[in-house]
Design a protein with these regions (language model features):
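Beta-strand signatures of extracellular beta-sandwich domains
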Residues: 90-94, 158
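Extracellular carbohydrate recognition and processing domains
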Residues: 98-137, 144-152
Length: 165
């Protein structure tokens, strides 16, 4: 689906596992986070959507694993600050290297205000050690409020499975 077309992005996206939060947070690892009433205001997933994920200032939300290769370059989502006035939302990729070590790579920081806004496209495959077309990696998306500066809501997490255009 061209979920972000209204924002000038004509790429095709697929919903990340449980990324709309309408049926709960199945597969997500939540600490200080929960599914709540209220959905992003653009309704890109569906007009009837009514839920999102609230992440407390001291919380963290980690998505189910997503398989990434060079044909899955970006992901996007909606976010808004729900409390606090200065805190940012750090967005990271959690992945394992060839030695089995877990790594986290910051791919973006959200500084939006108290209204729902679409994130910019954030890198998936370009920040991972994927040098060959046939290489894949399993990654998790980590949403982590920085420095306890405020709580956040996220919704409609999408992965670009086809590349640009």
């Amino acid at each position: 689906t061209k979920a972000f077309k209204a924002f000038g992005d004509s790429a095709n996206y697929s919903l990340a596992p449980s990324g709309a939060f309408e049926a709960g947070s199945g597969g997500w690892s939540l600490s200080g986070a929960s599914v709540v009433a209220g959905s992003e205001s653009y309704k890109v997933h569906g007009a009837g959507d009514a839920k999102s994920l609230a992440v407390a200032a001291t919380g963290t939300a980690v998505s189910p694993a997503v398989c990434v290769d060079v044909t899955r370059p970006t992901f996007r989502f909606f976010a808004k600050r729900t409390s606090g006035t200065w805190g940012n939302l750090a967005v990271k990729l959690r992945w394992k290297d060839s030695s089995g070590n877990t790594n986290e790579t910051v791919v973006g920081t959200i500084e939006t205000g108290t209204s729902w806004a679409a994130s910019a496209p954030m890198s998936l495959s370009s920040v991972l050690p994927l040098w060959n077309v046939d290489q894949t990696a399993s990654v998790q998306l980590v949403f982590d409020p920085e420095n306890y500066g405020g709580s956040w809501a996220i919704d409609d997490v999408y992965v670009d499975p086809y590349g640009r255009g």
